[in-house]
Amino acid sequence: MTENLQSESIPHEILPKEPFDLPMNNLKSSPKNKDSEKRINNSIAESEQVVDSALSNPETNANEDIIAPQLPSQNSEIIEKNSPVNKLNSSTSLTTHQLASLPKLEVTDHDNVSEAETVVLNEDEEKETSLVGSVSVTEDLGDSSAIGRTILVNNSVEPQMENTANITIVSPSLKESDFESEEKATNDNNGLIETNHNSKLEESSEHEEEEDEESNIERTEDSDHQIPQRGGTLEAPRKGGPRSGVGSRKRKRATVSRKWSTNSESKIKRVALETSQEESDREIADRRSASEQAHEADDEKAIKRKEAFDALLNIETEFTFLRNRLYGKKLLKLNEHEEMIQNETHERFNACIDLITERRDDRVRLATENLMKQLGNIKNVMDYVTKQRKYQLLFDKRRIRQALLTKIATKCFQLLNKQKSVHDPTYITQKTMSYRQSALLQKQRIEYEAAVLCELNSFAGFPTAPIIETASFDDIRNDLLEMGCLSENQD
């Protein structure tokens, strides 16, 4: 029932924004409103009595199937089609059109709601089913969002309170501000459904298991003292007390076996539902944890980067202050040194200048000495060259003179030889001499000439030079000037 109501919740757009246009005094004073309030109170009292009777007699018929308590999110899968619970839910479930038409109507429409509830209760009494569907009447008065009283029809023995869209019956004593709070509360309730769903599933499953165990124990112990049910109707106790015999024992065993089988099936279904829900919860938790860890890691990285940037900025600012101070000190020192240099009072600068001047003087002195030595070497080379040229000139003159003298001497010797041959009688008589005599004479003459030449070889002027006339003083002076022995200034 809760699933149907939750799926077919009334949209906020259908609800009227200002449902109380009429004054409140007129609503309270109208007899129709009073009658509708009385009917609503009577229907609520009847439903509470039915719930109390169902809770006081938690027995199931042996011929009917036992239906396990169902979770509100899984009702449609567990309820059988032919079970009376499904019929009851189908009879009590309202469509979207009916739910949409409820708030549009005024207070007079509460009569229809109360009649529907009475019809449901009458059908339940006619079928005479026990523990098929328990009607739970709740009043959501804790929050300002729950306006009016809500009537829920559930399949479980224990009423399950959830923040779902229920059938609301508006009381005429409410104000316009309650509708605004209702809209806010519906949004809050829809957000809280997911968070409370897992905890309620666990609590309901544990509570139902405990109730099943207690009910099984009580049924096995008090089965002889309880009144059996047949065909969904209650029977009066017999005068003879509880039944005895083989038939009653068989029935007891059959009921116990059916109870255990239904309990085992319900437990299996519960375990399957719990495992599936736990797996889905674990997956969601893992995803959330992974995403949260990633977000936390990103946040930590961003925080660390921010801290690092702040630290770098502080370091840079401090470094700029220190740098400016150092540069200021350096500039002051440089200005002081400049003044000292201009005033020629800087000790280190003066010492450096003295060293530079000393080294400069040494280099100049060495350069001058080297230059003088180079000049002296050049002079010596020139003297050597000039003297060599003079000696070469003298040698060439002597060689030329000797060559000329040899030529002249040969010519003179030839002339004298011709003269001798002309005036020498032996030369004349050679023609009359025999060949032997002429050969001997020629041999003697050659030997004589050779002996003369050998004697003259030891004397200068060989061969014998001719007599030359005496040269004048000017000729001798010119010759000496050309030879370089005399200069023009010298006489």
UniProtKB/Swiss-Prot annotation:
* A single GO BP: transcription initiation-coupled chromatin remodeling
Task: Spell out the Polar residues composition-biased ranges.
Answer: 54-63, 155-171, 187-196
Region span, Disordered = 1-74, 155-301
Question: Which compartment or compartments is the protein found in?
Answer: Nucleus
- Primary location class: nucleus
In this chain, composition skew of type Basic and acidic residues spans 10-20, 175-186, 216-227, 282-301
Give residues where Phosphoserine occurs.
Answer: S204, S223
Q: Name one GO molecular function term.
A: histone deacetylase binding
Q: Where is the composition biased (Acidic residues)?
A: 205-215
User: Is Transport a UniProt keyword of this protein?
Assistant: no
Keywords for the protein's UniProt record, in alphabetical order: Chromatin regulator, Nucleus, Phosphoprotein, Repressor, Transcription, Transcription regulation
The GO cellular component terms are:
nucleus; Rpd3L complex; Rpd3L-Expanded complex; Sin3-type complex
Tell me which domain of life the UniProt entry assigns to the organism this sequence originates from.
Eukaryota
The cross-references to SMART domains, in alphabetical order and at most eight, read: Sds3
Q: How does it assemble?
A: Component of the RPD3C(L) complex.
Q: What does this protein do?
A: Component of the RPD3C(L) histone deacetylase complex (HDAC) responsible for the deacetylation of lysine residues on the N-terminal part of the core histones (H2A, H2B, H3 and H4). Histone deacetylation gives a tag for epigenetic repression and plays an important role in transcriptional regulation, cell cycle progression and developmental events.
Under PANTHER family, the record lists: BREAST CANCER METASTASIS-SUPPRESSOR 1 (PTHR21964)
Q: What is this protein called?
A: Transcriptional regulatory protein dep1
